[in-house]
């Protein structure tokens, strides 16, 4: 079985840059193994929202910490970024913080790409997935080679070199919400990323089997693939606070279909705030008893996920980190 790891999701949509750095530093002090950050150009909310640049954040946190692994969860290397520049940025960070950097990638959302100049109708999944696969191939060729020529359907290189690259390149974690991309993660990813709260059958019957199937295609040991899940958890001994803390993150409770074509944080906020608190809370483990919280998290471990990254919704993140270290971490470590 793969090693059990506990991580912290730094909520870039909720906190300003300096505070977000300090929270990651605190996460290491409270015993977390990793800290991940989303890469949004625009947040889910216009009022009270934030969107610091993920790569600047990673570098700042890297300088302030010594142990935790840092990565994006996730970045889209296909539209507003050129994947060659992403490859250069992550190679540099991996040289600065050896063994501590990974690149988490996904197929992208209209919210972040249309505002930065994408022209035309937002592409359907088939094209976005094709772009992702091509960008991963391109980045790995740059990390392996010298004077690289690449002639893809979407991206091209001519005599390109990255001059500072760690041995072995940079681990790539592939985010998936369905079996097609999960299978690709098993075949081509160093890690796999998914998010919690979407029903047992998705993880147990679709995502994890697809990762295993993809690994088998390339004769890989699935235990060598870091299987990460962002666990949405609102834990507090005060049950009313545990419930109310979820409200800021109401946009996560919108369906993929509802979010697909929304490219404006004001419209996203409006759609999300129309949801009742009970619907918002369904995406979260809302608990005031530590044993109850850990029992719900254990399901994900039993289904085959080993890297548990905890996303807490409340504004008092230091309170969450203290409660996590005291109440949840000792119980969770025993699961491994």
Swiss-Prot record:
GO terms for molecular function: coenzyme F420 binding; glucose-6-phosphate dehydrogenase (coenzyme F420) activity; oxidoreductase activity, acting on paired donors, with incorporation or reduction of molecular oxygen. Catalyzes the coenzyme F420-dependent oxidation of glucose 6-phosphate (G6P) to 6-phosphogluconolactone. Appears to have a role in resistance to oxidative stress, via its consumption of G6P that serves as a source of reducing power to combat oxidative stress in mycobacteria. This is F420-dependent glucose-6-phosphate dehydrogenase. Keywords: Carbohydrate metabolism, Oxidoreductase. It comes from the Bacteria. Its EC number is 1.1.98.2. Coenzyme F420-(gamma-Glu)n binds at residues 39, 76, 107-108, 112, 177-178, 180-181. PANTHER family: 5,10-METHYLENETETRAHYDROMETHANOPTERIN REDUCTASE, PTHR43244. The gene is fgd. It catalyses: oxidized coenzyme F420-(gamma-L-Glu)(n) + D-glucose 6-phosphate + H(+) = 6-phospho-D-glucono-1,5-lactone + reduced coenzyme F420-(gamma-L-Glu)(n). The active site is at residues 40, 109. The keyword Transport does not apply. Homodimer. Substrate binds at residues 195, 198, 259, 283. Belongs to the F420-dependent glucose-6-phosphate dehydrogenase family. One of its GO terms (biological process) is carbohydrate metabolic process.
């Amino acid at each position: 079985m793969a090693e059990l790891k506990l991580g912290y999701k730094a909520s870039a949509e909720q906190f300003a840059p300096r505070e977000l750095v300090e929270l990651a530093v605190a996460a290491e002090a409270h015993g977390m193994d990793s800290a991940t950050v989303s890469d949004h150009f625009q947040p889910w909310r216009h009022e009270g929202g934030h969107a610091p640049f993920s790569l600047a954040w990673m570098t700042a946190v890297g300088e302030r910490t010594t142990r935790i692994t840092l990565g994006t969860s996730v970045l889209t290397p296909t539209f507003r970024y050129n994947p060659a520049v992403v490859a250069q940025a992550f190679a540099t960070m991996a040289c600065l913080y050896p063994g501590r950097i990974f690149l988490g990638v996904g197929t992208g959302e209209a919210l972040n790409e249309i505002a930065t100049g994408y022209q035309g109708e937002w592409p359907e999944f088939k094209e976005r997935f094709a772009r992702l696969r091509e960008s991963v191939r391109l980045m790995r060729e740059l990390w392996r080679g010298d004077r690289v020529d690449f002639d893809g359907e979407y991206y091209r290189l001519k005599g390109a070199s990255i001059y500072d690259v760690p041995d072995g390149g940079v681990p790539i974690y592939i985010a998936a919400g369905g079996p097609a991309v999960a299978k690709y993660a098993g075949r081509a990813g160093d890690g796999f990323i998914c998010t919690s709260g979407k029903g047992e059958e998705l993880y147990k019957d679709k995502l994890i089997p697809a990762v295993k199937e993809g690994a088998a295609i390339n004769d890989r040991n699935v235990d060598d693939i870091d299987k990460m899940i962002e666990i949405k958890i609102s834990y507090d001994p005060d049950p009313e606070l545990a419930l109310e803390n979820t409200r800021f993150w109401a946009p996560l409770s919108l369906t993929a279909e509802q979010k697909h074509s929304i490219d404006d944080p004001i419209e996203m906020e409006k759609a999300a705030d129309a949801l009742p608190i009970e619907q918002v809370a369904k995406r979260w483990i809302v608990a005031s008893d530590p044993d109850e919280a850990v029992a719900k998290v254990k399901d994900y471990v039993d289904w085959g996920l080993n890297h548990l990254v905890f996303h807490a919704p409340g504004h008092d993140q230091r309170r969450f980190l203290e409660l996590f270290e005291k109440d949840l971490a000792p119980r969770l470590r025993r699961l491994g």
